[in-house]
Curated annotation (Swiss-Prot):
GO terms for molecular function: urease activity. Heterotrimer of UreA (gamma), UreB (beta) and UreC (alpha) subunits. Three heterotrimers associate to form the active enzyme. The gene is ureB. It is an enzyme of class 3 (hydrolase). Pathway: Nitrogen metabolism; urea degradation; CO(2) and NH(3) from urea (urease route): step 1/1. This is Urease subunit beta. The lineage of its organism: Bacteria, Pseudomonadati, Pseudomonadota, Alphaproteobacteria, Hyphomicrobiales. It is found in: Cytoplasm.
Amino acid sequence: MIPGELFIEDGEIELNAGRKTVTLTVSNTGDRPIQVGSHYHFFETNPALKFDRDKARGMRLDIAAGTAVRFEPGQSRDVQLVELAGKRTIYGFRGDVMGKL
């Protein structure tokens, strides 16, 4: 083995397999770009992002960990969200939940 060498099996990797998802249209109504990270509670994103927040409660972007989606001013785009896993307890972010979902 060589230090840092990876042994990867053939095939596809499916992220978040078996979890509930929802697709929402999101519009940036602000005058600045807004970037949302992979594990940010989407319900609590910047108020300049307009979308059905009730459907986003307990959800995050369905993208690879450590990545983000950027919304330019005036831009609308569809995003897929995936339900949060684990204890489903939310603290921090914008302080809109601060407890169990």
